[in-house]
């Protein structure tokens, strides 16, 4: 049986791009002091410093409350202007983390829209979706599912049972069901999203293939690697039957198959064979796909690094780096792929002591390390942990047993210094206290 979603997450840091993987940098700001010219004929008086008041979330809520009141006075309770004002108030209350009041305001907006345009007006879809998002942020996942479901009901009634716009709502329902540890029900939403695309498009269309890959990725993110491979193989069969054995569309499922084995930490032969088949297929194409070739070579390099090929010198990494130099966004891709902490073999983090209960509180561990040219971590050090010592050993073991993509600097495989990863988790303080006793 597949495991439930992990209660831990990890973040990696980049001083330039918050979502990229990079090393910690110490950022210092310098201030220049202006001096008056000693020979100046006129005395220059410094302008008084005026402090600009900083608006707080509470200030924004009060302003929106006043706006709602004035809008009702000016336009009446059941008006589009009033409904929009309620949505603005709800957004402000949500930003201030007053989720109970935010729910009331979103529901007031829904009530007004329905009074104006009927119970199935499409105007309620957006506030109902935002209401679900607010419930999720408040960790009220049951009500989140209900709100998203109501928004989807309206969408199906207005735009048709098979309209693709409801897929974003299915995704939200799926995520909330995962939060409730209802994996089977969550997967059912993803299957329904795939079926919606299949009903609206030809079986061999790019839209259907993309939907299959999307579902495959969802399965892989939950650790269901064989089921993920099954979807890639399904796409492979569709492409071969519709476009032939040499169509470049085959590259995507081949890479998907190969990388599932690596992410599963399974060095089975079919994994590297799929990657090599993708490379051969691209080389046979009449027009060179530099990005595709760079990606395949990167993934072959990741396989060799992950499974410790003896004497591997990173040839595929170097060739991939060179190919990226021919692309308009090559510099950005080089930075994304060949700098920072990029896993090639992910050692699972022990879930002992972590909790998905609603009353669980947040904890984290921040760890720093280097990687050598073979992708091995070294000098692994805990920089910060909360609560101290609770998950330190688990995170240290995770980093030491994982493997990372080495850097490529000016075309040469190089070590990566001073990388950092933050692992976030939730735990029950009482459980820790009982364990220590």
Each language-model region and where it sits:
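N-terminal secretory signal peptides that target proteins for export/translocation
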Residues: 1-15
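Bacterial N-terminal signal peptides
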Residues: 18-30
């Amino acid at each position: 049986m597949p495991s439930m979603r992990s209660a831990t997450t990890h973040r990696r840091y980049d001083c330039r791009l918050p979502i990229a993987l990079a090393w910690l940098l110490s950022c210092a700001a310098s201030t220049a002091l202006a001096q008056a010219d000693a020979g100046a004929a006129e005395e220059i008086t410094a302008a008084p410093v005026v402090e600009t008041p900083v608006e707080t979330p509470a200030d924004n809520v009060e302003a929106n409350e006043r706006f709602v009141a004035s809008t009702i006075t000016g336009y009446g309770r059941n008006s589009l202007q009033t409904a929009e004002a309620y949505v603005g108030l709800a957004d402000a209350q949500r930003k201030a983390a007053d989720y109970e009041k935010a729910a009331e305001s979103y529901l007031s907006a829904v009530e007004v829209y329905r009074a104006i345009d009927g119970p199935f007006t499409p105007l309620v879809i957006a506030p109902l979706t935002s209401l679900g998002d607010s419930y999720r942020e408040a960790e009220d996942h049951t009500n989140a599912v209900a709100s998203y479901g109501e928004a989807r009901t309206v969408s199906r009634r207005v735009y048709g049972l098979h309209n693709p716009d409801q897929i974003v709502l299915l995704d939200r329902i799926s995520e909330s069901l995962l939060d409730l540890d209802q994996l089977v029900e969550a997967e059912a939403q993803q299957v329904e999203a795939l079926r919606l695309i299949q009903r609206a498009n030809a079986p061999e269309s790019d839209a259907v293939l993309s939907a299959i890959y999307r579902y495959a990725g969802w399965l892989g993110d939950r650790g269901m690697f064989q089921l993920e491979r099954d979807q890639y193989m399904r796409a492979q069969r569709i492409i071969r039957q519709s476009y032939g054995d040499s169509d470049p569309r085959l590259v995507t499922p081949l890479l998907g198959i190969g990388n599932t084995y690596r992410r599963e930490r399974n060095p089975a032969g079919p994994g590297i064979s799929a990657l090599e088949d993708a490379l051969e297929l691209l080389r046979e194409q009449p027009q060179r796909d530099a990005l595709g070739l760079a990606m395949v070579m990167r993934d072959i390099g990741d396989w060799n690094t992950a499974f410790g090929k003896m004497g591997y010198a990173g040839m595929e990494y170097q060739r991939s780096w060179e190919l990226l130099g021919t692309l308009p966004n090559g510099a950005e891709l080089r930075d994304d792929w060949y700098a920072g902490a990029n896993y090639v073999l992910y050692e699972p983090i022990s879930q002992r002591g972590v909790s998905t209960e609603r009353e669980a509180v947040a904890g984290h561990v921040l760890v720093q390390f280097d990687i050598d040219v073979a992708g091995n971590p070294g000098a692994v050090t805990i920089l910060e942990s909360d609560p101290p010592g609770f998950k330190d050993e688990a995170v240290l073991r995770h980093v030491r047993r994982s493997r990372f993509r080495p850097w490529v600097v000016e075309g040469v495989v190089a070590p990566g210094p001073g990388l950092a990863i933050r692992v976030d988790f939730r735990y029950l303080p009482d459980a820790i206290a009982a364990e220590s006793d």
